[in-house]
């Protein structure tokens, strides 16, 4: 059982390729299921966000595992294996563990330190559990990753310094908003609500608290990122928020939550197909629908009227893109998308406030070492169990032989002989079994377990049970 991580992210691939490998929820579930149906993959989990598509797997062998995952990823995305291998990265064992922990902390994010990725990792765990591809190895690894992410945000200043993709995007998009607009009555800044599962705020902080004061905002989509965006703009003083989603009742629920949480915000839901009709009254559109194609065309935006005197800004956080790039040709219309955000992040805009990265990296290193020590001890445990089981069988066999050869021994003597033989065997096994557990935590720990198996002709069964659908994460299986 070995952990393998294979993926593409904003660090390794162009945005155009990330768009093509982005996986919708249903496709992601099917991909994980098909992966564990191969002989090379025991468990599988997929983390898919606007900036990364990554597969985490428990495999028996490195090369067959990589080959199986690449082949299926190519089939499900339509991207050739040759193109995938040019841009993907592969991490194995300790490096794979370190990578996931760094991802969960936000160290590998486009906006270093952003907290949204922690919730996305948790959702990936839930998805894998739902379809039955989450086993003990990935469940333990994922739970540890969530713990590392929480530590990074609570024990350092990363939570204050690290912006989410939403807050970073709003900061960049805000540069195009009219600076001398007439402010409207708006909500006072509210205390950031916190996600009970991750401990991370469900709205993000902006460097300029007045950036959105009095703005009229439309949010396309009602998923987790859309909810984060809606809460963020409400918290920072937006006067009006329209929510448009293909499932209208989800848009209504989000609008109701905003109304309850921010009394001065006028929030309402509009049918998704009517979204373009409301553009004339909107300053900023935030889109992250998860659709597989354009949801607003340049023609629809142009029909909303001339914006030469009052700009209309689009913040497109979706992959694939939601907003037609041709809107950039329209007077007064500005589009900020993932590609532009990546360029801004590479300029240093995103990481300028992160002051405690060293402390976070230390946390990651500490947790990786602890996780590896536990894994090493777990790996040798079946060998120790098999050794003790074999010794027990030898004891029972010899005692049975003794009873057959000396049937006249009284019960008291027989019991004393039995205790003595078992004590001798236990004492003989105690030191080597304790020592092999200690040695197992070292870099060559597996060698000692293998030596025991060879010397005593052991064949321990190493279980790799899969979490059953419906079992709560972290529960005994």
UniProtKB/Swiss-Prot annotation:
InterPro entries: 4pyrrol_synth_GluRdtase, 4pyrrol_synth_GluRdtase_dimer, 4pyrrol_synth_GluRdtase_N, GluRdtase_CS, GluRdtase_dimer_dom_sf, GluRdtase_N_sf, NAD(P)-bd_dom_sf, Shikm_DH/Glu-tRNA_Rdtase
Pfam families for the chain: GlutR_dimer (PF00745), GlutR_N (PF05201), Shikimate_DH (PF01488)
Involved pathway(s): Porphyrin-containing compound metabolism; protoporphyrin-IX biosynthesis; 5-aminolevulinate from L-glutamyl-tRNA(Glu): step 1/2
One Gene Ontology MF term: glutamyl-tRNA reductase activity
Record EC number: 1.2.1.70
Function of the molecule: Catalyzes the NADPH-dependent reduction of glutamyl-tRNA(Glu) to glutamate 1-semialdehyde (GSA).
NCBIfam families in alphabetical order: PRK00045.1-3 (NF000744)
Subunit structure: Homodimer.
Listed name of the protein: Glutamyl-tRNA reductase
